[in-house]
Amino acid sequence: MSEPIQRKLILGSTSPYRRELLARLRIPFEVAAPDVDESARAGETPQQLACRLAMAKARAVAAQFPSCVVVGSDQVAELDGQALGKPGNHARAVAQLQQMRGKSVIFQTAVAVVCVETGFAQMDLAQVKVNFRQLSDAEIEAYLRAETPYDCAGSAKSEGLGIALLDSIDNDDPTALVGLPMIRTCRMIQAAGIKVLGA
């Protein structure tokens, strides 16, 4: 009886944060950039947007590499039911953090795993509730000058100095806030045929 094929793993993302998280598994993988329009659709909730984009990213890369197992992920920060995107610049980051101070923000982090050749396709969503402290304008300014998190949904990096902005974090998948829920990702890539612990 022949050994099952050990498929190649591909991360469908250019995010350095997701790459670093997946590398923690100590299994080989490649990175490919998904060509996906990330615009929200009319009436789409932040949760729906994160799920749709995670699957779209995985499918876009899987179409180029049909024999591989592809991981796609997306994160949308949600405040009062509205999506907060990546700020992109200092002024927008200041505005986001001013909006979020003293409030709870839900980070919707979706992950999808796809293999075209086997027909495998799964998706899951991790919701992280982040409670922000009542921040002063001076604290916001000092944080942004120190860490420049303009490429992060919600204008903060919890894995760095951004932790000082928070009162508490409530979730069941610790890395979800950084951009890739690794408990869910491990479960799905193993179901797709990737050996994580060599067993």
UniProtKB/Swiss-Prot annotation:
It is an enzyme of class 3 (hydrolase). Gene3D superfamilies: 3.90.950.10. It comes from the Bacteria. The keyword Hydrolase applies. It is found in: Cytoplasm. GO terms for biological process: nucleotide metabolic process. Its main location: cytoplasm. GO terms for molecular function: nucleoside triphosphate diphosphatase activity. The record marks Y17, Q75, E159 as: Important for substrate specificity. It catalyses: N(7)-methyl-GTP + H2O = N(7)-methyl-GMP + diphosphate + H(+). Keywords: Cytoplasm, Hydrolase, Nucleotide metabolism. GO terms for cellular component: cytoplasm. Its cofactor is a divalent metal cation. It holds the Pfam family Maf. The active site is at D74. Its EC number is 3.6.1.-. Nucleoside triphosphate pyrophosphatase that hydrolyzes 7-methyl-GTP (m(7)GTP). May have a dual role in cell division arrest and in preventing the incorporation of modified nucleotides into cellular nucleic acids. Belongs to the Maf family. YceF subfamily. This is 7-methyl-GTP pyrophosphatase. It comes from Albidiferax ferrireducens (strain ATCC BAA-621 / DSM 15236 / T118).
